[in-house]
Amino acid sequence: MDFKRVKEYFAWLYYQYQIITCCAVMEPWEQSMLNTIILTIVAMVVYTAYVFIPIHIRLAWEFFSKICGYDSSISN
């Protein structure tokens, strides 16, 4: 895939984003506010997943290992 196709693909994705969020009909300050809100929400979701998913995986591993009889737990 050459650079031109990648650039066109990202342009298409950005166009789809504008259509889905109705950014095409907003004023520039409204677009920046909406983009800021969306970026903030995405950043919070990524941070929360980064912090809490490993903890939940470890707890689930310990829970199911006790149920299945595998008594060795992950040491901290």
Swiss-Prot record:
Keyword annotations of the record: Endoplasmic reticulum, Lipid metabolism, Membrane, Sphingolipid metabolism, Transmembrane, Transmembrane helix
GO BP: any one term: sphingosine biosynthetic process
InterPro entries, per database record: Ser_palmitoyltrfase_ssu-like (IPR024512)
Superkingdom, taxonomy of origin: Eukaryota
Parts forming coiled coils: none
Pathway(s) served: Lipid metabolism; sphingolipid metabolism
GO CC aspect terms: endoplasmic reticulum membrane; serine palmitoyltransferase complex
Segments on the Lumenal side according to the record's topology features: 30-36
Residue intervals on the Cytoplasmic side: 1-11, 58-76
Conditions for induction: While expression is androgen independent in the hpg mouse prostate, it appears to be androgen-dependent in the kidney and brain of normal intact mouse suggesting tissue specific regulation by androgens.
A Pfam family matched in the record: SPT_ssu-like
Record's keyword annotation contains Transmembrane: yes
Topology in membrane: Multi-pass membrane protein
GO molecular function annotation: serine C-palmitoyltransferase activity
Compartment list: Endoplasmic reticulum membrane
Tissues of expression: Expression is strong in hypogonadal (hpg) mouse prostate, weak in mature castrated mouse prostate and absent in normal intact or androgen-replaced hpg mouse prostates.
Membrane-crossing segments per the record: 12-29, 37-57
Primary localization class, coarse: endoplasmic reticulum
Role of this protein: Component of the serine palmitoyltransferase multisubunit enzyme (SPT) that catalyzes the initial and rate-limiting step in sphingolipid biosynthesis by condensing L-serine and activated acyl-CoA (most commonly palmitoyl-CoA) to form long-chain bases. The SPT complex is composed of SPTLC1, SPTLC2 or SPTLC3 and SPTSSA or SPTSSB. Within this complex, the heterodimer consisting of SPTLC1 and SPTLC2/SPTLC3 forms the catalytic core. Within the SPT complex, SPTSSB stimulates the catalytic activity and plays a role in substrate specificity.
Assembly: Component of the serine palmitoyltransferase (SPT) complex, which is composed of SPTLC1, SPTLC2 or SPTLC3 and SPTSSA or SPTSSB. The heterodimer consisting of SPTLC1 and SPTLC2/SPTLC3 forms the catalytic core of the enzyme, while SPTSSA or SPTSSB subunits determine substrate specificity. SPT also interacts with ORMDL proteins, especially ORMDL3, which negatively regulate SPT activity in the presence of ceramides.
Stated family: Belongs to the SPTSS family. SPTSSB subfamily.
UniProt-recorded name of the protein: Serine palmitoyltransferase small subunit B
